[in-house]
UniProtKB/Swiss-Prot annotation:
GO cellular component, one term: respiratory chain complex I
Organism the protein comes from: Bradyrhizobium sp. (strain ORS 278)
Alphabetically ordered keywords of this record: 4Fe-4S, Cell inner membrane, Cell membrane, Iron, Iron-sulfur, Membrane, Metal-binding, NAD, Quinone, Translocase, Transport, Ubiquinone
SUPFAM superfamilies: HydA/Nqo6-like (SSF56770)
Domain of life: Bacteria
BP-aspect Gene Ontology terms: aerobic respiration; electron transport coupled proton transport
Identification of the protein by name: NADH-quinone oxidoreductase subunit B
Cofactor(s) demanded: [4Fe-4S] cluster
PROSITE patterns from the UniProt entry: COMPLEX1_20K
Family from the record: Belongs to the complex I 20 kDa subunit family.
InterPro entries listed in its UniProt record: NADH_UbQ_OxRdtase-like_20kDa (IPR006137), NADH_UQ_OxRdtase_20Kd_su (IPR006138)
Cited NCBIfam families: nuoB_fam, PRK06411.1
Gene name per UniProt: nuoB
Amino acid sequence: MSPTPSSGPVIAPAPKGILDPATGRPVGAHDPYFLEVKHELSDKGFFVATADDLITWARTGSLMWMTFGLACCAVEMMQVSMPRYDVERFGFAPRASPRQSDVMIVAGTLTNKMAPALRKVYDQMPEPRYVISMGSCANGGGYYHYSYSVVRGCDRIVPIDIYVPGCPPTAEALLYGVLLLQKKIRRTGTIER
């Protein structure tokens, strides 16, 4: 049995990727930087870049993160790895060991007893290392701010690069924080932090 030809026009499937709602084209399709790269590659067959640009590009595309889930925010952190959000498509893959990680996500209430463990794990991470503070409890103590046993913000123990607000913050908020971290790495470079 042969397929029957349709009398109407054939509609191509929508392009994949993030589309600009104003133009309907993929985001970055008319970015001058990418147009310059495309022209240089088609003209010369290779692309010239500085070592710092190459290292920064590689680092932002392969950030390995480890969890330091202390409370309910860790559930949202797990959700960002699931198929709906799939943070790995942005090059953000989980690791179990701090020695293999570039990013640590602190999610939840940090107590005085847990603070030395947090610092020890942070010190085991290779340079350059980044920390995302996720949720009100990690950012400033949250609901337990006035408790005698709570550290009022994990920035008192380790330096924080990105703060993700919320109680608990949504998976979208964490994903946005990851994208902000990648933007920060691109802006500051990697050779010198």
